[in-house]
Amino acid sequence: MTRSTFYYNRREKSDKWSVERAEVASIFYENCGRYGYRRITSEMRNRGYTINHKTTQKLMKESELKCLVRIKKYRSYKGEIGKVAPNLIVRNFNANKPLQKLATDVTEFSLFGVKRYLSPVFDMFNGEIIHYTLYERPVLDMILEMTKGTIKKIGKNTGAILHSDQGWAYQHKKYQQLLKSNGLRQSMSRKGNCLDNSMMENFFGLLKSELLYLQDFRDVSHFEQELHDYIKYYNEERIKLRLGGKSPIQYR
């Protein structure tokens, strides 16, 4: 083989995946390093590329693109334990239609010497966050406002299930009456069994891994704005493999 042929062949080989490599990098940076090779492969296919996960992984390695997400445990706020509602979910997190099975919980963020408490409602059908409240303290009004916002979105008397742990706020008479008067069915996890509400735990772990642990914030106000932006991104853009490479809202 002549020298010119050798260098031509080497150049052709190195350029074979140049377009795909650029697109992989684009997807990686568009999502702030939150996507690993499997999710990037799914998004590549959404964009019309024929590529398998091994090739994506190779291109990422060559380009030194490493997913920055590491799932970490979190501790949600819980009060006294005392079950007042049955477990209607029983770890059956599958739903045939939107707004049929919902889950909620509270998680705590601690930064700049202060705390914030997030109370979202998660749709088991597609993983969408359909409503949420953010408070400085884990007070009952946070839960009631979250519930009222959820009812406004899904409508009254739908028979939807709203599942939670046995935290004190979910045992409160005002919360129970609000659900009952608007046709929502209350469901509670068993005592000390986090797996009964694992979809919420998974979401909180994802949220903290992809937002809190990846980003620097100027102050609490900056964090709050980024949190709102992240939930919007999560609902509208962040694809899920279990949804066939679609975001929650795209799947709905």
Question: Model features per residue range: what roles?
Answer:
Residues F6, V24, I40, T56, ...:
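Mobile genetic element proteins and their domesticated derivatives, centered on retroelements
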Residues T133-G155, I161:
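Active-site beta-loop-alpha junctions of metal-dependent nucleic acid enzymes
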